[in-house]
Amino acid sequence: GKNYQACCPFHTEKSPSFSVSPDKQFYHCFGCGEHGNAISFLMEFDRLEFPDAIEELASFYSMDVPREQTHQTPAQLKQQHQAYQQKQNDYELMANISRFFQQQLKVASDKQVAIDYLKGRGLSGQIAKNFGIGYISDQWDGMMKVFGQSAETRQQLIDLGMAIQGERNQPYDRFRGRIMFPIHDKRGRVIGFGGRVLGDGTPKYLNSPETRIYHKGQELYGLFEAKQANKQLQQLVVVEGYMEVV
């Protein structure tokens, strides 16, 4: 037929009652009554505000969201587009790095010390997965070997605070021998990391610096995860560290 059927993502069911109509551009669940279009779906399912849902849809199709006319010159418009594209590349790279850290928690030769620490703090594998928690071994360039293959990407890693420029123009990993906590913005994009050292090293916690996509004063660790768990979030309890949030 013209419509797609699936189990509803908004309530638990065994028989598909969720219908999507490409022609009419809306969805409807005959079980719970949820109804809307692509924008309202993102707002409900991903817990996004209206402007963020618009931005998310636009980025999916590699489109710029039109802004209020400000009489910009062609050069200014070009610069604005380049800045937008750069940030999209940044988000993609940070997401890949986050997946790499999560994989290292499963395959690194010294993974057990990280797993034992997390278990000792009462975290199950599912909780670690829900928060995207990962691990990076205590190596000089464990992450750089994977992602720093080109001069352009090496500079991008430095700009994003994932690498530090060393002597003889050789960047090295900022985070080494640490449990890694990805920091998400309100749209769920990875914008930075917090790393908890294993052992007696210092500092105990190492955080991403300010970058073009990460502004510490504007972000709250765990807010995205909290909104995913409860779309009618009424209040928050502010605690000190990453582990306390988890």
Role assignments for model-derived ranges:
Residues 1-155, 159, 208:
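Non-catalytic accessory segments of DNA primases and related replication-initiation nucleases
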